[in-house]
Amino acid sequence: MNNKSGFTSWISPSNIALVKYWGKKENQIPINPSISFTLKNCNSKTKVTYSQSNKGFNYEFFFHGEKKKSFNKKIDTFFKRIIQYCPSLNHLSLKIESENTFPHSSGIASSASAFSSLSLCIYEIEKMINENEKDFFNQSSIISRLGSGSASRSIYGPVAVWGKTKHFENSSDDYAIPVNNYHKIFNNYMDTILIVDHEKKDVSSSHGHELMNTHIFKVDRVNKAHENIGDLKKSLISGDLESFIHIVEQEALMLSLIHISEPTRRSM
């Protein structure tokens, strides 16, 4: 083993889905593909300091300089899932320091930026210690997914696809891929975020995904998402804004209807 102690730091953006994944299988596998724009100014910065541990894996987590044990359950689950990809963790002690440029759990995908930045740190440590030759960003996307599904897309940008679909070659349920073929008009697109409530939302995204598994519109939603991915790809390439706006608005309205239909839940 080399580089048994040190630190690394990464900044990773949140993202906004144009076609959203809603509903998942075991191990964070989506029931439908999704495509997103990254939000470069809504980001998480994570620093991980590591050292050799004689007592097995352990960590401390700090959010904006304060210990946040309320996040430990999600982080514990994340580390259990990724240990097969990052065996060096078995012999490490970590100090994780994270901060956001925007509120967490308020409707912006803070888990996407948080877990993607953490995953980039963790996999960089793995590569330094075990001299892993696997593709860095691909593997980072895989382990990001195991923390938060949408985090897999935050590894890439400005446009990324996650989920197997016939419309994008090499797409996968396990990781996101970058989308490089899009019209230059989208280079100047910006996202305006108005925060009217800093409080944590009533229903978590994770619980919302669980509800989708038994939703009466599940099959229709999955089929429509696949169709919209294909149509949106055409709009992105051609720069057809009328079509682009129609598809994205249709997606927003469809997800809103799903949220307020049976079973009744509010998770936006």
Where in the sequence are the language-model features?
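Single conserved hydrophobic/aromatic residue that forms the stacking wall/gate
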Residues: I258-M268
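Intrinsic disorder/low-complexity segments
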Residues: I31, E249, T264-R266
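ATP-binding N-lobe of GHMP and related small-molecule kinases
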Residues: M1-S106, L120-F137
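ATP-dependent small-molecule kinase catalytic core of the GHMP/sugar-kinase superfamily
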Residues: D135-H259
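Surface-exposed loop/turn and secondary-structure junction residues enriched for glycine/proline
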Residues: V19-K25, S34, T38-C42, S105, ...
